[in-house]
Amino acid sequence: MPQYIPIMLNCEGWRIVIVGGGRVAERKVSSLLAGKAEIVVISHKLTPWLKSRHTEGVISWFERGYIEGDLEGARLVFATTDQAAVNEAVIMEATALRIPVNHAGDGEQGSFITPSMIRRGKLIIAVSTSGAGPRIARSLCHEIDKQYGDEYETYIDFISNVRAFIKELVPDGSQRQSLFKLLAEMDILTEIREGNFRPWSEEEITSWISEYREV
């Protein structure tokens, strides 16, 4: 079994080709939308959900089967059809073009697999069994989902915003690290959960930085 390496990709503007228009393709598209990629689906038919995304202009749709040459210019490829020969042809072309490719039915035939995932705004928690037990990964994600609620989106947004100000206003590396540590130790989550939190203004952030940068 391959030994996979976890990685986070910035796919904004990438051409991503998905061959197949069924439920599996639907799941792939759903997970890719947040990345602002140029998503192209090649299939004779689409699920109602995928049709809606096409109508909205979120994805492009080639209403036909896959033909060799469809992968030109792609940065990522997903083979999701229920036809083994088609999936194999997609894998072969992607491999020849050195494009990372995912085989939805048999991960080892492709060059990468996708984990089960929980997203809370900027917070992404990914779980994988390296293809050994996808159902187990989904079950683990379900358990983790119960532990990390929507409050984490607000929390991470707050942390991200304050860190951005620290990076801009504090040139000294050691001072920045001290402020990052203080920020991480603040019990903001409790405030959010109890309904007592409100986002800080720019003035409040700069005041906090000024107060604690020399501590």
Predicted regions and their residues:
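Hydrophobic, well-ordered beta-alpha structural blocks that scaffold small-molecule cofactor pockets
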Residues: 1-45, 50-53
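Residue-level detector of alpha-helix initiation sites
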Residues: 23-24, 85, 131
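Hydrophobic beta-strand scaffold residues
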Residues: 39, 61, 100-101
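Short loop/edge segments at beta-strand edges and connector loops
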Residues: 43, 61-65, 105
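Glycine-rich, highly charged phosphate/nucleotide-binding loops
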Residues: 52-72
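ADP-ribose/adenylate-binding Rossmann-like module
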Residues: 76-82, 87-113
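E1/E1-like adenylate-forming module used to activate ubiquitin-like modifiers
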Residues: 103-153
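An accessory alpha-helical subdomain
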Residues: 131-215
